[in-house]
Amino acid sequence: MTVNILGTKYTVTKKKYSEDPAFAKSGIDGYCKFQLHQIVHCDMSTYPDWEDESPESIHNTEQQTLRHEIVHAFFHESGLSYNANTVDGSWAVNEEMVDWIALQGPKVYEAWRQADAL
């Protein structure tokens, strides 16, 4: 699948945990490779210790990971990925901020939709 991020096509790939060493090496369930225009996320049903999770929990976690990585891609394509540096690092790659946008984005979108603000 591809997704358009501000005019740049990113390939979105879902991989099994065992198919991508980055999951184990970095303790992550997704990542965005800006240079390659790739977003990769883990099939959470293959993630260690997730075998007892419900299909709904797996699905919701995978959606959250995709939203998170897409936010990273938007920041990068906006020129904000590493150009907003501070002493402690760029605000645009701050995981807490990216998580907030990824978690609250659907709610913000729904509020905009209800207000006919789209």
Regions found by a protein language model. Name each.
Residues T11-T13, Q63:
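Non-catalytic architectural context of zinc metalloproteases
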Residues Y31-K33, N83, A117-L118:
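Short, low-complexity, polar/charged sequence segments that are solvent-exposed and flexible
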Residues S45-Q64, H76-Q114:
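Post-HEXXH active-site segment of zinc metalloproteases
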Residues R67-F75:
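Short active-site segment of divalent metal-dependent hydrolases/proteases
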